[in-house]
């Protein structure tokens, strides 16, 4: 399946586990430049002001994302973020299209420490865990399109994203993945969503390097236009 990524950066698609590359892949949506916007955490579910006119049930859009602030990977080092990179990207998308926004929050929050989060993620992946979600949505049946956002941790989306996708019936919907990463691009995200969202069409995803997320608004707009979600 085709994925959309900015042309100016080649993405390593290898399954690196440890060492500098592997630890980067383990927590890839975890870096941001100095000018990354800092803002209060949004409420669990928010509805941005409509920008494209009224929507019927068939074309209503849900943007659901998981993002982790705190100590994050940054060009081989570490950096503390008030706002996680995936949230920065999700806000950028929500400014451009008419959608309802839902932040996926774990019942047991991930540690602020980068290394502790890496270790927890490895345990969850090895156990094929389904971390519980705090305040989950009651239903998504009113939507025809779902944008799913997350970092890439150890070459795939965090296991909490599988908790989310397995909780709902995506039959007949279109799913648009978007991720922030360090070295692994989309990783196995499209394949994983194909497995956990049976009956849905998995559209080409968007992968943005976490350290440079604020620099890619034009790429976000192109991706949304190619997906038919942005027409102006």
Where are these regions (language model features)?
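Structural recognition of the beta-strand scaffold that forms the well-ordered cores
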Residues: 63, 103, 148-149, 176-178, ...
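Glycine-rich phosphate/pyrophosphate-binding loop and the adjoining helix
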Residues: 205-232
